[in-house]
Amino acid sequence: MKLEGSCHCRAVRFSLESHTPYPFNLCYCSICRKTTGAGGYAINIMGDVTTLKVKGRRNLAYYRARMNGGRSDARRHFCKKCGSHLWLADPSWPQWVYPPAAAIDTKLPKAPERVHLMLGSKASWVPVPKASRKDKHFKDYPEESIEGWHKRRGLYR
């Protein structure tokens, strides 16, 4: 599925192809919470890095999160003008980029269930739906990948 996204001021616009467009993964880690500023969590989508096209590249900056006394290898790309988080690129998975659903302008399909992950890092003020068939809870990361989740449900496009 072709996804188009942008920052708030539209100085940076991008497009990419995603086989995994369902916004199901809600991450409550402090990094996602603080870099996206949305509801205490971020919902990350996965896209093919070889299809990433960017307009306004000169307006991009990136941030490497502080982790375990050092810096993460992952780069969180932002707009220099308005500060919108646009995507994460991690050398551990060089074939993918991970834009937050909030940066996507294309209408996304509704996920049939949600995964709430990194709940061990959740801020105390953030409400989380009770665990159920439709809302799975994980203290850290689940074993199933974004790709695996989509494939198991026949949603991989």
Residue ranges and their predicted role:
Residues 1-6, 11-157:
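A short Gly-Trp-Pro
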